[in-house]
Amino acid sequence: MNKIILLLFSVLCLMGRAQGNSEWKMCVVSDVHLMAPELLKSDGKAFQDYLSSDRKLLGESVEIMDSITNRLLAEHPKVLLVTGDLTKDGENVSHQYLVDHFLSKLRRSGVRVFVVPGNHDVNNPHAVVFDGDKTRRTTTVSPSEFASVYADYGYRQALARDAASLSYVAQLASGLRLIAIDACKYEENDFDKNICVTGGRIKPATQRFIREQADAAKKAGCKVVVMMHHGVVPHFSAQPVVLPEYLVDDYPAVGRMLRDCGADVVFTGHFHSQDITRDSTVTDVETGSLVSYPHPYRVIEVSGDKMSVTTHNLRSIES
């Protein structure tokens, strides 16, 4: 069943007005975790052990993304936001496969796609090829390579880019700007110890960038909406204690900063859960993973002073 939630956010009203009609549509997907087919040289114990310790349908990730892309082409939104974890583990071949087979198809159809990295996407020691009982490392991407691969999906058309991270600002419509925040800690990943850091934080320099860009947007007469991978508001009471790595570090202060910057809504992912929650600062619209049940994506329509957030789930794939 599709789930529709109506939110009364004046911050997004300009989206409808900017298009010259009463409605404006965008879609949101998260945690695509696409695994390029060539990463599975030979199925065997190594890949099956990996799957048994995870909750992702990695072997079906390409087919899932193909089905979702066809759904999005049918929806034909103005904008698609992808809130991080684009790949299984930051493999260069997975990033290229996602762009070449899916994102480029959406772009050619007229959908403007904007991405932000997740904790799996950059400088990841877990980027491997599975070959029977063994694995071997394969090429991951650096921050600059990530921006190059996704040049047509946020970085080339950015109004401004943060020198300290992969954060950027883009114009979504007349009167509305996107602040895409990179809060990942990929520079702390350790190849010797095979550690990929799950948690996130916003660097002081990036916080200054966000404030400066929010001020520039205000002076230009624009409202702002934010997307990032890590959560800003807890989605259940114990989350800050039992699963703090799924919230950005010092999340209360981050929420206050975003509120002060005029951002009412933050689109997030990371937790592979589908939820919308609000505290005294912002509303966190968390979108679940495409490769985890129930494989959701969101369709967001703005009409007047109402924003409807509709959740659709992928029920089946051909295989």
Language model regions located:
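His/acidic metal-ligating clusters that form di-metal
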Residues: L72-V79, R112, R177-A180, F191-T283
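Hydrophobic h-region of N-terminal signal peptides that target proteins for export
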Residues: F9-R17
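Binuclear metal-dependent phosphoesterase catalytic core
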Residues: L172, V282-S319
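N-terminal active-site segment of His-dependent metallophosphoesterases
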Residues: G16-N92
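Extended active-site neighborhood of metal-dependent phosphoesterases/phosphodiesterases
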Residues: Y97-F209, M307
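Active-site-proximal beta-strand elements of phosphoester/diester hydrolases
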Residues: E23-A36, G175-N189, M227, T283-G288, ...
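Active-site environment of divalent metal-dependent phosphoester hydrolases
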Residues: M35-E38, K88-G90, N119-A127, Y186-N189, ...
